[in-house]
Swiss-Prot record:
Protein name: Glia-derived nexin
Membership in a protein family: Belongs to the serpin family.
Lineage, uppermost ranks: Eukaryota, Metazoa, Chordata, Craniata, Vertebrata
Annotated site residues (Reactive bond) in this chain: 365-366
Signal peptide: 1-19
Reported function: Serine protease inhibitor with activity toward thrombin, trypsin, and urokinase. Promotes neurite extension by inhibiting thrombin. Binds heparin.
Outcome of swapping residue 204 to N: In a breast cancer sample; somatic mutation
Claim: Membrane is one of the keywords in the record: no
Length: 398
């Protein structure tokens, strides 16, 4: 009999170092790059929607799955991710610890859990390796009562994301007879801006959405020194980007949008990768600029099944081909029935108090250049020491 293995990722972010760094396009960047490729597939079918995902969360769940896979299923996962988890477990463990380190100052929580019908039926090496590399816990639930199982999992999710994400699961996603395991990843981030946006500067301004319509939305504003730059995509279309650091300075928000308002956001998205973002970090220069940025909240739930299949991860969704022999002790044939991610982002003025130097800059007399985000844009929340992209998305209408 074939058993369902639903997977659920969720991510939550509220926005207002370790000593060892990793080489360009490091292991974590490869993981994040998989998430960016998934994002590229998602936006093709939803070009005008607000999309929020966690590339790091996607990489974590695929990594946990890889530890339970065998044969061609495992090969497909490793090929798309571009690494085998077993061979780099120690490095992944270091990266995961670095991302949640208190040295970041900003709050980052990554939680992983396997909810199972019977923990005694799960292979010990699968549990041990996931606990060691991904700090994954195992919890028993009664899938024969889908409503109760959903309540238990949703309560865990809500707690791990500080109440930002609830109702991830609905009972109809759990088969009381066939479901054997639910794998969940939660990523939570709360960052305070290094240079706070003063509430009195927030005004309603015009934002031209992806559908061409104009909307009046609250816009944050501040005059300060930020690292920014511009470059061209292979199609010779130019776009601008800026780094907005959080107060711990190990995590930043990066914003990118086309230079010309006539250029659609979709024209630059295929160009984006962790390697591209690395290049931004090397060419950006500090400038005193007037930043105008929408104040927004966006939440999106995405089924990652089809995007992953397009990338080449197909067997794990096929009940006749999936091979997760390293997960259960019995002869049950597991396959993935769902792989969902729900992510939420809130961007507001909140942050540390503005410094005296910043206050002085705010009243400088010379006219600075402007960085105005008044049309669809991309955002990235990046852990700079490792290159991990914790969150990314497109905002077409704040």
């Amino acid at each position: 009999m074939n058993w369902h293995l639903p997977l659920f990722l969720l991510a939550s972010v509220t926005l207002p170092s370790i000593c060892s760094h990793f080489n360009p396009l490091s292991l974590e960047e490869l993981g994040s790059n998989t998430g960016i490729q998934v994002f590229n597939q998602i936006v093709k079918s939803r070009p005008h929607d607000n999309i929020v995902i966690s590339p790091h969360g996607i990489a974590s769940v695929l990594g946990m799955l890889q530890l339970g896979a065998d044969g061609r299923t495992k090969k497909q996962l490793a090929m798309v991710m571009r690494y085998g988890v077993n061979g780099v477990g120690k490095i992944l463990k270091k990266i995961n610890k670095a991302i949640v380190s208190k040295k970041n100052k900003d709050i980052v929580t990554v939680a992983n859990a396997v909810f199972v019908k019977n923990a005694s039926e799960i292979e010990v090496p699968f549990v041990t390796r996931n606990k060691d590399v991904f700090q994954c816990e195992v919890r028993n639930v009664n899938f024969e009562d889908p409503a109760s199982a959903c309540d238990s999992i949703n309560a865990w999710v809500k707690n791990e994301t500080r109440d930002m994400i609830d109702n991830l699961l609905s009972p109809d996603l759990i088969d009381g007879v066939l479901t054997r395991l639910v794998l969940v990843n939660a990523v939570y981030f709360k960052g305070l801006w290094k240079s706070r946006f003063q509430p009195e500067n927030t005004k309603k301004r015009t934002f031209v959405a992806a559908d061409g319509k104009s909307y009046q939305v609250p816009m944050l504003a501040q005059l300060s020194v930020f690292r920014c730059g511009s470059t061209s995509a292979p199609n010779d279309l130019w776009y601008n980007f800026i780094e907005l650091p959080y107060h711990g300075e190990s995590i930043s928000m990066l914003i990118a949008l086309p230079t010309e308002s006539s250029t659609p956001l979709s024209a630059i998205i295929p160009h984006i990768s962790t390697k591209t973002i690395d290049s931004w970090m090397s060419i950006m220069v500090p400038k005193r600029v007037q930043v105008i940025l929408p104040k927004f909240t966006a939440v999106a739930q995405t089924d990652l099944k089809e995007p992953l299949k397009v990338l080449g991860i197909t067997d794990m969704f096929d009940s006749s081909k999936a091979n997760f022999a390293k997960i259960t002790t019995g002869s049950e044939n597991l396959h993935v029935s769902h792989i969902l991610q729900k992510a939420k982002i809130e961007v507001s003025e909140d942050g540390t108090k503005a410094s005296a130097a910043t206050t002085a800059i705010l009243i400088a007399r010379s006219s600075p250049p402007w960085f105005i985000v008044d049309r669809p844009f991309l955002f990235f929340i990046r852990h700079n020491p490792t290159g991990a992209v914790l969150f990314m998305g497109q905002i077409n209408k704040p």
